[in-house]
Amino acid sequence: MSGIIATYLIHDDSHNLEKKAEQIALGLTIGSWTHLPHLLQEQLKQHKGNVLHVEELAEHEHTNSYLRKKVKRGIIKIEYPLLNFSPDLPAILTTTFGKLSLDGEVKLIDLTFSDELKKHFPGPKFGIDGIRNLLQVHDRPLLMSIFKGMIGRNIGYLKTQLRDQAIGGVDIVKDDEILFENALTPLTNRIVSGKEVLQSVYETYGHKTLYAVNVTGRTFDLKENAKRAVQAGADILLFNVFAYGLDVLQSLAEDDEIPVPIMAHPAVSGAYSASKLYGISSPLLLGKLLRYAGADFSLFPSPYGSVALEKEEALAISKYLTEDDVFFKKSFSVPSAGIHPGFVPFIIRDFGKDVVINAGGGIHGHPNGAQGGGKAFRTAIDATLQNKPLHEVDDINLHSALQIWGNPSHEVKL
């Protein structure tokens, strides 16, 4: 294979999956085939999309009801020659799913890149091992928390929140994705003030915390804003990838003047991936493509919290982020939304140690504040790694958290 193989879920009311697959393969490449003169067929053969696989799936009554017609469901695989497109994500996505995305009844499940094509993508700069080296934490999941309620607040408020989270043992604190450039907490001021706080906590408590600052602005200003952040001392850049595009992420990741990890936020991605019938699958969008384009971290809805993905989907995202690939470093999985300490055993059981446990209200809503919330999570992580049930741990901060949010992991076996 020298090009790319696209895997689709299709719904066909003509009940002829083979014909539908061939129509897609031709429609996204040379347009027609059977009516072409033999000589022209020979000339265009190397550009023709090739149907590799057609598999019929069981009928699904809910799908028929939603589409208001009876359809045949199937999985098809089509190979697109590398000759047809330039080796960049805009060209790849337009080739494999451009006008086809308007069909409304086709979902792009996966893209399989040839080794030759993979060479054109950077992958994560740091990856899991690089992030762990920055923090000198190698034997447990990382803990991340989020600034809450920062809109309309000043730098002093930010510093207080940051200090409490760091003292609580949080490894990474990230901006809220809706915190943009503003007069009260400008980008460089946040970074400089944040570093002062984190250095003070490190000197006093010996705990290192990294700050992920939200890089925002117009598309053609992003690189300059990212470089300003780096010059001010940014540890990590948070980036709302899908508000801009995967190619913009790749551009930031490839820039040698932006030598810091990039954390990809999934904002807007639901517009592409939420439907089971059409769009782009979450594992492809939030897993494989983010990793290839250069994200060191990928945030996505966890299977447990308030904005839940199905467990199978969430684990598939993580698989794409962390599976061995000689071309790319591994990216951190960050299952998010509605996470509290009682979910920690689930997260470690399902995602392993190479995961970032990300909490907002589960830290800030603790009765002992963010310090208590962070400590509750750290205790839950340590207990889980020691195979100790959370309800047996004698720790006031963890006990308080379990009293408030419950302990759904009571029967979890690791």
Swiss-Prot record:
Needed cofactors: Mg(2+)
Modified residues (N6-carboxylysine): K174
EC code: 5.3.2.5
A GO molecular-function descriptor: ribulose-bisphosphate carboxylase activity
UniProt GO BP: carbon fixation; L-methionine salvage from methylthioadenosine
Catalytic reactions of this protein: 5-methylsulfanyl-2,3-dioxopentyl phosphate = 2-hydroxy-5-methylsulfanyl-3-oxopent-1-enyl phosphate
Note: Has no RuBP-carboxylation activity.
The protein's role, per its UniProt record: Catalyzes the enolization of 2,3-diketo-5-methylthiopentyl-1-phosphate (DK-MTP-1-P) into 2-hydroxy-3-keto-5-methylthiopentenyl-1-phosphate (HK-MTPenyl-1-P).
Name this protein carries in UniProt: 2,3-diketo-5-methylthiopentyl-1-phosphate enolase
